Amino acid sequence: NTLNGNNYGVILNGIEAYGNLVTGNTINDSNYGIRIYNDAHDNNLFSNTIQDSANFDIQLGESEDTISFNNTFSTISVDSNANMWVKVYLDLTVYDNSSNAFSNADIEVKENSSVLYSTDYFGGSDDRTDVNGTIETFMVAISHYNGSSEPDDVTTNVSVRFVDWIISGTYNVSNSLSFSVPDFRVQNQNNGNMFYSIGGAISASSPSNG
């Protein structure tokens, strides 16, 4: 849809305005491109272009947990009792050092302290990486307008583990993350077990290993 020259391009008003998906619109020359207020909540703005608004491209009054994905806008007003999450789809891939897909790796993804994805090693029930070295794609927040027209950054914490090798870090996600599991192996000569780190081999050794 293309909406031109309106007072409001899109308006979501009241507590019954929830769970809506506003997507694929071009909104030009409005006073307010999109306005959400008066206890509207849990609405989704996907792939809209809002431009040349007289006041604000997006105006959030009293409203909770609006989600923004792939929207183009330049001006926003967020009241003290409103918030909006800006999100992207996270594509996570695990490789070996030869750039081959690495399957069966454990993954944990946290948004700040909230767990979004967790395999059994990390206490969850989500799937490990598949034959393509990937997990299912899902949304993570990259910024949060929380009672302010200036967003706060949201960090994504990711841990990847295979056998005794593990890496954990904090990332500012754009849309994809990739991790490389080292190719080298360390063998415990006493029992023949292979390890992905020297530390793992040492930890599993006994005094009789010499």
What does each of the following model-derived ranges do?
Residues 1, 20, 25, 43, ...:
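Consensus "Asn ladder" position of solenoid repeat domains
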Residues 90-96:
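A short, amphipathic beta-strand motif
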Residues 8-16, 32-39, 52-62, 74-84, ...:
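Glycine-rich beta-solenoid repeat tracts in large extracellular/virion proteins
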Residues 99-100, 122, 134, 184-210:
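Acidic Gly/Asp/Thr-rich repetitive segments characteristic of extracellular carbohydrate-active
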Residues 120-159:
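Short Pro-Gly-centered beta-turn/loop motif in secreted/extracellular proteins
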Residues 83, 167-185:
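Extracellular beta-sheet/turn segments enriched in Thr/Pro/Gly and aliphatic residues
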Residues 11-13, 21-26, 35-37, 44-46, ...:
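Extracellular beta-strand solenoid repeats
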Residues 98-121:
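Short, ordered, surface-exposed loop/turn motifs in non-cytosolic proteins
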